[in-house]
Amino acid sequence: TLSLHDALPISQILGQYYQFIRLGFQGYKEVQYNSLTIAKYIHDEIGKMAPFVNYSDEVVNPLFIWYLKPEYARAAKWTLYDLQDKLSQHGWMVPAYTLPSKLEDYVVMRVVVRQGFSRDMADMLLGDIKNAITELEKLDYPTPTRMAQEKNLPVETKIFNHGCRTHKK
């Protein structure tokens, strides 16, 4: 039996069951394959961008994370939190956050490719990332999040941070 009072919403799970029944195994497999293909494309393109390093070399699920190259991060006047804010101005929800305990010094960004996310949308996201980087690189002064990081002060993300508040590197 399913309870509607569980801690996590079940609507997404029910939606997946519905899709699986409606599409069948092969149809659902194709949906997941398409999401994975788009995720690999975005992963590869982000890996080509000068400021970034992908956390892993391959994508096995339709999600991945990346971070600023350490040498780039030391000289940059901005952080991934600033990139998150720029992308949110264009309607993208690409969170920047610290990793969980014992890795909380690392700030990463995450992309999750959901069903229906097309190659055209991926190209729009990549274009918005490139435009945001161009804007951020033109800054004359460090952003408040960059200054806070330099002083080892708490930097709170607006989206998600595993309960960690600081970034020390």
Question: What is the predicted role of each segment?
Answer:
Residues L4-P9, Q84-S101:
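Flexible glycine/proline-rich, aromatic-decorated loop/lid segments
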